[in-house]
C-alpha cells in the first residue's frame, strides 16, 4: 500500500500500539490494551497477546500474535521508503496461509489486512 507521507511519520504512527485501534480493525475490536503480560486483545478465539518488534531505524514493524491455542503467528510488516529523502513510502504486510487455514479464510485475512492498510493510508493522508 503506497502512502503519500514521509516514511518516518508513517513508521512513527504505525509502530505505536496505542494507535492500532485507529486503523487495525481486528485489534481495535478486541480492545488492545497493555497489561502485565504485554499487549493483549480479545478475539473471537479468546484472548491473544501481541508482541511487537523493538523500535528501529529500518522500518520493520514485524509482530507476533499468540493465539489462545498457544500458536504464535508471525506477521512481517515493513515501511519501505520510495527512495532517498522520500516523501512517500510503501507499507508491506506479508500474509501467509498457515496450515489448517482454508482458502476462504486466507482470502478473508488478506482482505482484512488490505482494508486495515487502506484505513492507515486514509488517516495519514488526511482522507
Predicted regions span which residues?
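Short, conserved beta-turn/loop elements at beta-strand boundaries and strand-helix junctions
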Residues: 56-60, 84
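Short, exposed beta-strand/loop patches in secreted or surface proteins that constitute
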Residues: 30-34, 41, 52-54
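Hydrophobic pocket/interface hotspot
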Residues: 10-14, 20, 39, 52, ...
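Beta-strand/loop substructures that line and gate deep hydrophobic ligand-binding cavities in soluble
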Residues: 65-126
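Short beta-strand segments that buttress and anchor functional surface loops
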Residues: 37-44, 61-68
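Hydrophobic ligand-binding cavity/cleft-lining segments
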Residues: 1-33
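Generic structural detector for well-ordered beta-strands
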Residues: 2-4, 51, 78
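Short acidic/polar mixed-charge low-complexity motifs
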Residues: 44-48, 71-73
Amino acid at each position: 500500500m503506497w502512502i503519500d507521507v514521509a516514511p518516518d511519520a508513517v513508521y512513527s504512527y504505525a509502530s505505536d500500539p496505542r494507535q492500532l485501534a485507529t486503523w487495525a480493525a481486528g485489534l481495535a475490536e478486541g480492545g488492545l490494551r497493555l497489561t502485565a503480560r504485554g499487549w493483549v486483545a480479545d478475539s473471537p478465539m479468546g484472548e491473544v497477546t501481541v508482541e511487537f518488534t523493538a523500535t528501529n531505524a529500518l522500518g520493520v514493524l514485524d509482530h507476533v500474535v499468540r493465539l489462545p491455542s498457544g500458536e504464535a503467528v508471525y506477521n512481517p510488516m515493513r515501511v519501505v521508503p520510495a527512495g532517498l529523502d522520500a516523501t512517500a513510502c510503501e507499507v508491506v504486510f506479508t500474509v501467509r496461509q498457515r496450515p489448517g487455514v482454508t482458502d476462504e479464510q486466507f482470502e478473508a485475512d488478506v482482505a482484512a489486512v488490505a482494508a486495515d492498510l487502506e484505513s492507515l493510508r486514509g488517516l495519514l493522508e488526511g482522507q
